[in-house]
């Protein structure tokens, strides 16, 4: 009996999980994208063999995606599918990937990363520190001290929210001032604790964490029930605080953008920034060059150089 493309997708996802060691979020996205492709194929004909998938089928599917999704989402879904067929070609399941010599042009408008203004950052930091002093219960105090550690770590290292939530206690070395981060694709990198303020915030939280009874997890950031803190919990707290204090939406990823832009504006080599952010390609980091240029233009406009000679 010949395997259908659904069978090969299942095997590919197993390969991604157990051999490529993709993160849970990436696997979930792959599952959704692959299932969507199967639904499309079934709407056109019966589930078929990968050898029957040709360029016309792929192009028609890409056109279908483009009518329903934003360019960035389309690119992600296409990249997932392209990786799948490349895997089939590598394993000699198909002779050649239908993506070979297939030109897919999806224009994505360039959107500069949103950063946090210095004044807004000061207000947020002041808020989390003040909250820790005004708590009435051990539960409230624990959450407040943990929030301080989260905010300080995000702004001082630029790590992703997923990386923060998956951070292990033994990955932090206070003596050397380093943290080992396992990013996308389980790629390991080092970030640095160069501020005593940040170290103290993390150590204060670590002390409270140790005082919790029956610690049953190696994750550094936990909730009151000793469970790993969820990304949505961090986003929710930050969303509520920023709306209440600033009347705007601040996200954890904006801390990352702010970290990178601040380094660039302080003349840090972009290759160092690439390493700290865990970007596999320098092109991803180069978007901050455009953001820095925008900051330069704003500064020049505010200076009104020519008007000074009128």
Question: Model-found features: residue ranges?
Answer:
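Conserved catalytic core of the tyrosine transesterase superfamily
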Residues: 1-310
């Amino acid at each position: 009996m010949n395997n259908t493309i659904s069978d090969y997708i299942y095997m590919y996802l197993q390969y991604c999980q157990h051999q490529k060691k993709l993160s849970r979020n990436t696997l979930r996205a792959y599952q959704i994208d692959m299932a969507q492709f199967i639904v499309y194929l079934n709407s056109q004909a019966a589930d078929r063999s990968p050898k029957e998938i040709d360029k016309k089928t792929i192009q028609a599917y890409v056109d279908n995606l483009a009518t329903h999704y934003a360019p960035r989402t389309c690119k992600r879904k296409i990249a997932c599918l392209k990786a799948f067929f490349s895997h089939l070609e590598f394993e000699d399941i198909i002779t050649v990937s239908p993506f070979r010599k297939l030109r897919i042009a999806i224009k994505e408008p360039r959107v500069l990363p949103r950063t946090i203004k210095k004044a807004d950052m000061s207000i947020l930091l002041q808020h989390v520190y003040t909250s820790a002093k005004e708590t009435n219960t051990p539960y409230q105090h624990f959450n407040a001290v943990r929030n301080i550690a989260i905010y300080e770590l995000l702004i001082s290292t630029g790590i992703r929210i997923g990386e923060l939530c998956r951070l292990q206690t033994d990955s932090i070395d206070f003596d050397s001032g380093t943290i080992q981060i396992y990013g996308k694709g389980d790629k390991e990198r080092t970030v640095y604790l160069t501020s005593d303020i940040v170290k103290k915030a993390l150590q204060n939280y670590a002390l409270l964490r140790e005082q919790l009874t029956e610690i049953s997890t190696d994750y550094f950031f936990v909730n009151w029930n000793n469970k790993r803190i969820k990304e949505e919990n961090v986003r929710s707290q930050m969303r509520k605080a920023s709306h209440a204090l600033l009347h705007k939406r601040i996200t954890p990823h904006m801390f990352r953008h702010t970290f990178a832009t601040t380094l660039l504006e302080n003349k840090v080599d972009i290759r160092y920034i690439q390493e700290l952010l865990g970007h596999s390609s320098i092109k991803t980091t180069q978007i901050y060059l455009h953001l820095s240029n925008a900051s330069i233009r704003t500064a020049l406009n505010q200076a009104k150089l020519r008007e000074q000679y009128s």
